[in-house]
Structure formats: C-alpha cells, structure tokens
Amino acid sequence: DKYGIIAYTVPLLVYTNLDREKQDGLNRVMNGESYTWVNDVIQSGVTVLDSQTGKILAIGAGRNKTGVNQLNLATSDEIKRQPGSTAKPLFDYGPLIEYNNASTYGYNDNGEYRLFVDGPYSYTNGPAINNWDGTFMGEMSIRRALALSRNIPALKAFQQVDDENIIEFVSNLGIDPEEHSGSLYESVSLGAMEGGVNSLQMAAAYAAFSNGGYYNEPYSVSKIVYRDTGEEETHKEVKRQAMSDATAYMITSILDDVTVTG
C-alpha cells in the first residue's frame, strides 16, 4: 500500500528487516518450544524493534494460527488492547519529568523536590483509586513508585501535568492519546484506554526512551526492486525528537530498576 503497488501482479524483490535468528527464537516461544504456556487459549502479540532505527526485526503474530488471512495480533488495529501499567511512563512520569522538571526522586514544588504519598486517594470525579494489592506504602520517590507500579502516585503525577502537554508527549510517541475536546480522562493514567494499543505501537514508543528521546516510525521493508526494470525504492526513515535526552535517560534508568526491584 505504501508504494501503491499490487504485489501479486508486479514482479518484485522485497528486502525486509527481518532478523532470522530473532524471528526463529520468537517463533519457538510462541509455539511453546522454549516457553511453557499455561494453556492453548492464551494469546500473545509481540514486536521486536531496533530502537535506534525503527526496523522491525521480528513479529509474533499470535499463537496456534493456521490458514491465511489471520489477524496479526502484534500489529492489527482491529485487536488493540488496553496497555495497563505500561502506560505510566508514557502518560504520567515521562510528561511530569519533561514539562514539570521532576526528577527520579520527586515532583518539583516551586524548586523543592517532594515525594509522592501512596495513600488513600480518589479520582477528581469522586471514585476511590486503589493499588493492585489493596495496600498503601506511604511516601516514595518517583523511581520507587514506577518500579513498583503503584497506581496512586501515577495518578497524582498525571494530575500535575497540563493535559495539552500529555497529549503532545504521547502523540510524539505515535500513540493516540484519546483526547476529548482537548482533555483526557484520568483513567488513561493507569492505561484504561477506549481504543487501546498494539505491541508495535508500544515497542516504538518505548524505543524512544532508549534512543535519547528520538522516536523512529517503525517499518518492515527497507527496499523494493522492480525485477523488470531494476528500479529501486528505498525506505526513508521518519525520525523526530519526542522528548529531551534527560527525560529519556531518567525514565530508562527507572525502568532498569523494574527488572531488579519491580
């Protein structure tokens, strides 16, 4: 579609970014050869990207798929899912650091950095908000709150940033912020989205954190060659700065902690 070509009728050589080793490894996971799934009902969609370029290196389209014209669970716009807590760096802490000069320690209160309090709290329109384990942990840094995926500090971080800034931040990362007349529902701070996202969108958005704040539009085909004429069309990378390198560094540092203490 991108090149306006009907691939079934035009002789082409198509050069993709597929990394055979990574794709074979992912296939073994999806097929249950190198990972034990609980049952055959559980589905999965996986995208493996080169964070520096946006090249799609491997795709896990789903499990137990046979036949043709099957939906690709990794990239389909028809089967998007709510991102849950993976939305917190995108909607909450990333914008707080980028626009409100927060640090990994705490939020900026007129030049003084303060800890968030993980305690009883409610959404602006009234309903109480809880953590996944039903407990409260008191004062904590942004680093600890994100590493432990606490909901209440995440909502408080979201509430401190102007909606227009969050919309800009998320949009620059290729995610539809689902704004309503310029405003956002507070539930998106915890990943409760109406339309949802797919793994391709999330992989590309997160890649910007490890790429100095630069977002690369993901792509799978690097070049096509018309066999009849030898004419080539090469992909032109789409790259933009989505956030400062300082914000990207701090979020990446916190996410590193998730693998250790989260």
Model-derived segments and spans:
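Flexible glycine/proline-enriched surface loops and loop-helix/loop-strand junctions
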Residues: 7-12, 70-78, 137-139, 147-154, ...
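Sec-exported extracytoplasmic/periplasmic mature domains
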Residues: 27, 31-35, 54, 95-102, ...
